[in-house]
Amino acid sequence: MQKKVLSLVLVLAVLESIVPVSAWGTITHVRMSSEAGNPYTGFKMEYLSGSIAPDAGYIISTEWGTKFHGYYVNDALNIANKMLSLAEGTDEKAFAKGWLAHLMQDRVAHGNGDGLPKDQAYGEGYSNYAAKKYGLTHIEAEFFVNGRVIHEKGWDWDFVRFAVPTELIVKTMRSLYGSAPNENDLNNAYNTFAMEYYGELAFWNSPSGNTAYLTLLLFGTVSDYDDYVSDVHCNPYEESIYLTNHPNARSTYAAGTYIMGVKKVKSSDGQIKKWMKEYAERLEKAGAIKVNRKFEDGWLVIEFRMVDKYKADRIAKEVLQDMARSEEIFQFINLKGDEK
């Protein structure tokens, strides 16, 4: 039995669940931020935690998702800079720097299309471009790009741990808006967020995840990171990494050429996240993983440990088959021969 450890140290979690409109998927955000480099030596986990933390705001409500990201780039910079100014200690500063990284990466993925923060310098945004080109929803496009990142950019499975300071987020939001989510909402949101994240990470690292990835290549789905280069004159992946380290940089792209109206989110747009969360819950219930949840020095600590990889991979196959049976999602993955 192969044992692998994934520790998520998160400080926050949902009273309600909505369809989030994020940009790059969480896995891609972590990979980009890791490639960009952590300016705070010894606090890499705090930095990487910040690089995905803003998206959990959408689990609380659309309002807080918007307030965590900012509507335009200048709003996003103001949010991150306020958090940096309020951060106490290197650990909180590293987290705030990760939060800034997330927002700067999102501006490339969203452009002036669906999602926040908006930056018309990047046209309709890479995630929106990919979704429209391949007939996907926004969330599906992110999910598939995550799969490509893991299989093509590489992933250190044992090297993932997240730490999110609740008090810093509350303090930042109150300073900016005069109010903040309560601790219960934050804790619930990040418990949900952690299960979605771990479920997707475990899925893509399973044989069934490999099958899904190969199917993406076979059908040409989000088949080239460089598709968007001719439109915005930059590689969206590399540009996101550049902006992580140069948040005040201005693109030389001629704004306004490729502007797309905000689309209405399809009812199925959150289905993949539900599948990934349910997959993680099934893993825990089946004893394939151990999940340790505790509060530690003001942090909500969520630690995942894989204890039965064979069982986890078997459940992943069942999840992939469920996806294949969906008429709206994964319709291009034909596993009908596996149905009883």
From Swiss-Prot:
Report the Pfam families cross-referenced here: Zn_dep_PLPC
Which organism is the protein's source?
Archaeoglobus fulgidus (strain ATCC 49558 / DSM 4304 / JCM 9628 / NBRC 100126 / VC-16)
Which range is the signal sequence, renumbered to this chain?
Answer: 1-23
Known InterPro entries for this protein?
PLPC/GPLD1
The identity of this protein, by name, is Uncharacterized protein AF_1571
Q: Could you confirm whether the keyword Signal appears in this record? A: yes
Give the record's keywords alphabetically: Signal
UniProt superkingdom: Archaea
